[in-house]
Amino acid sequence: MPAQTTNLFLLEDLEDVGRTSELAERDLHALHAVANWIRTYVVKPHQDLGRAGPVCPFVPEALERKTLWLAPEQIADRDVPDVVELINGYQRLFLDAQPTDGDDASYKVIVVVFTDLSAERAQGVFDDVLQHLAVPSYVEDGIVFGPFYEGHEGTAIYNSSFRPFQSPVPFLFVRHGVTGDWKFFLDDEDWLNLWARRFGESAVHALAEELRRLPWRVGRD
């Protein structure tokens, strides 16, 4: 568990009045909305996903290991530098959180839920914040951020008509980058280069494993 837990909640913590009694009603409602969305959508298969398995294969394992935390924040009146500093704080908290090594550490994720941010403003706020944080956080600490909000136009890897990044409340997740992230970087050469430098030989193996699954290889085996 992270050393600082007052503002971090496992999904099951939301049912504990003792843990949530000091939360503003807006914050508690937003956390419940995201938690329900995770339980009913993110960890389930979807017919439009284009592959088997849950919408996000990472999340069921994180829930099982109790390494996924929700954190409510109100930022409507804050400017971009303030939000950048806020997320920097969560990044430091994430890096210090137990576990810090082993398999469990690979499944840590903090979901920062912006409880008073409208969907209309979310894209602009996230774009501005990530312009400051995304590259240095990845290069220095291997951290990736994932923005979700209603109206997000990002599409699924295996189905360009399916938009899985649309959440009921805007949030930004913080997690370790993994070798499988290359699929999200294929259309961005700069990010693909950063990924290759970070993972080195493991990156080559990840691509080779994917190539082995292609039809031309299957036909030879």
Predicted feature locations:
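Expand to "…catalyze enediolate/carbanion chemistry for C-C bond making/breaking, isomerization
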Residues: P2-D221
